[in-house]
Amino acid sequence: MQNTIYEYESISNEELKNHIINTTELHKYFTLDWKDLKTNQYCGILNFNDQDFYILPKIANHNDEKNLNIFIYMLMYAYDVKLLNENTSLSENLKSNNILEVFVQMFANGLLQELKKGLYKEYLTKQDNLPVLKGKYLINENLKYNFTKNKIYCEYDEFSENNSLNQFFLYTVKYLQKFVKDKKLLKQCELVFDEVEYKQVDINRVETINFNRLNVRFKISFEIALLLLKQSIPLFNQDKKSFAFLFDMNVLFEKFIARMVKEL
């Protein structure tokens, strides 16, 4: 396998080395000691000049493909990610796609399968100036806004798909399109959300989204989406578009062991 680097190893590719040094967003993932640039505990993929560079944990000595498969298995097990096609092996998935592409397709396929069962809706409280009374009459707002009697300011509940969970998914499917070549599944998901308002999402606040018996079927898709949003790093350096998809191996190993213990 070409373009493979291992954790805590020096980077010999001069172009890649200069790219990392000149890209501020990447500095926390590498260590520069004098002129020697080394990887640290972060593993994953770094795309630069249309080339994929894999940073892998050294588990099986001198076997790049085996190390990559073990790394991805750890990711999938720790985060409970299912293969896009369970009849297709992980190696076959990776022959034509990089690791980020594979994870995005898994996310999009899982989300689309749930959306085909029905879009999640919930009751949202709204206030509006309407020609007829709907819900609760708001005295103060009517005195403030309505000088004539042809409108009624009221508050009511509406069963709507335009809720925070669907807004999160819409943001995610649009955002991830910039990282992948095959956008088909993401665009199919996007079409389902045509009545949902697009909003910029703060990924540090989305954990406040609550799950119940009506939307719990979307929880795995939500967790994978959150993983992709947090670990995908868009990079722009000298008008060249690239990205990184990196994981802290210390955190990954803890999650992997925690799930293993939970299943005992």
Feature roles, as predicted:
Residues 263-264:
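A short acidic/basic microdomain associated with nuclease active sites
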